[in-house]
Amino acid sequence: MSYNILRHRDHPGGLTDPGLLATIREDLARDGWTLLRGFQPDMEAFSGVVTTLCRRVTFDPARSHTTDTTQMVDAGLGPIGLHIENGNTPRCPDIVTFFAQTAAFEGSQTTICDGRAVWDRFDDALKVRWSQRMTVERVLPEALWKRYLANEHPAISDPAQVTMEHVLQFKAAIPDQDFALHPDGSLTYRLTLDPVRPSALGGETRGFANAVLGPSHNYQPPRYAMADGTEVTPEEIERIRALAEEVTHEINWQDGDIAILDNTRVMHGRRAIADANRNLFIGMGTI
């Protein structure tokens, strides 16, 4: 994986420089990620990057908003395993962007890992197993699933507007998902997906890009089951985690950095936070 840094001195027009967007897309197509450094953006400028790259913006319903298109990242202080953002939702973002408004003095490096490199490290048995489809199942509290649906359904914008008709419409619009509603308003959600996939940005090369190795911050831990009926075990996850660590790299943040990732190819995580004086924001969506 190349360590791509696009610097302001090479793009004097700043974040709206005509050549910058083309270079970002070249880096994403080649390496799956890039880093913008020295542009000194504010939150409005970061939001502009998100809307330029993403035709449609999406959110994590458990996070607080900072603008109409961005949210604050707040996931405790411990390390976070590799994952794609919103990887267990029916509309997985194609692009995820991070803005280090204030970088930590120590620790808190964002880890990045090309799913194609992980897939290349799988032996034949692992490749056969993970070429199957996988079902994710978890229980979502009423507040979270209604916030998600209010953002994703085109006819509503407020969780208070959600009705069962909207739920059924969303289910019909996106295949491979099912649910069971409970008396307390919570919902058992099931999504069947491909844990190994080609990038949404183009090309046929597949990569291990999913949320199996990742956290469940703000959510109930999911249950993962393969198409053959077997569950994904903790031992299996740790084996893959070790393989992925061999090809994992770190972003050592500087104030004002913006990282842009192909969320259908490159997984990300975080080292433990040693300096809590940091502010990181996220924006994501579909191309």
For the regions a protein language model found, what residue spans apply to each?
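Active-site environment of non-heme Fe oxygenases that use a 2-His-1-carboxylate facial triad
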Residues: M1-G13, T66, G76-L82, R91-I287
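N-terminal non-catalytic cap/leader segment that marks the start of a structured domain
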Residues: M1-N88
